[in-house]
């Protein structure tokens, strides 16, 4: 497991102190209230310690942080909507789930996803990750969380297949993980680990593992 910190961050020392822990990294599914709480903590940390200065907003680092903040806002909105729908007696629709990656007590990455069979993509194998992001000061967490999600798909009987609707700036990163663009699409991508030679393999425990380079 390879996790590192970007040394070019504004306040790297603050986050490194939070993340350096003897506790084993944990990835687990969160209930809506806990997911909302953890997102708020992550957003507060980013706003207080990581937001770029006005002259940095257009560089790669600034765009990464701003994109992460916008994704968090979007996911928070989804959670609020789901909570309202669940309070309705006539609730029906896609059930989103939230899987988070923790180092010690700090959440460093999250995936918002749903099972395709229970959505408008019911005729498509796999699970769909609607949003996935990591703390802007951490590198390597996203691919580790994706590995976990591939095995989640496998355990659900979906052969490890993952679907995403990729942001343009994220397409290359998804390709490095083995995703391929769907036919007739410019953003919808699918990962089939069994067809991603040189990127994925199954270990002795029949778990999918990503071949990091």
PLM region descriptions:
Residues 2-137, 148-161, 165, 169-213:
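Non-catalytic substrate-recognition and accessory regions of acyl/acetyltransferase enzymes
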């Amino acid at each position: 497991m390879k996790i590192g910190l970007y040394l070019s961050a504004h306040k790297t020392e603050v986050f490194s102190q939070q993340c350096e822990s003897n506790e084993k990294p944990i990835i687990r599914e969160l209930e809506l209230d806990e997911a909302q709480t953890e997102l708020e903590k992550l957003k507060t940390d980013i706003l207080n310690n990581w937001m770029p200065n006005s002259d940095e907003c257009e560089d790669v680092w600034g765009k990464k942080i701003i994109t992460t903040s916008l994704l968090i806002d979007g996911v928070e909105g989804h959670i609020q909507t789901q909570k309202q729908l669940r309070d309705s007696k006539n609730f029906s629709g896609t059930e989103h789930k939230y899987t988070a990656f923790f180092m010690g007590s700090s959440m460093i990455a999250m995936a918002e996803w749903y099972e395709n069979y229970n959505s408008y993509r019911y005729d498509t194998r796999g699970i769909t990750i609607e949003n996935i992001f990591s703390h802007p000061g951490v590198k390597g967490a996203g691919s580790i969380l994706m590995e976990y999600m591939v095995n989640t798909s496998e355990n659900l009987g979906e052969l490890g297949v993952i679907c995403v609707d990729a942001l343009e700036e994220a397409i290359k990163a998804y390709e490095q993980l083995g995703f391929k663009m769907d036919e007739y699409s410019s953003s919808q991508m699918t990962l089939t680990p069994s067809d991603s030679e040189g990127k994925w393999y199954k270990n002795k425990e029949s778990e999918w593992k990503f071949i990091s380079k």
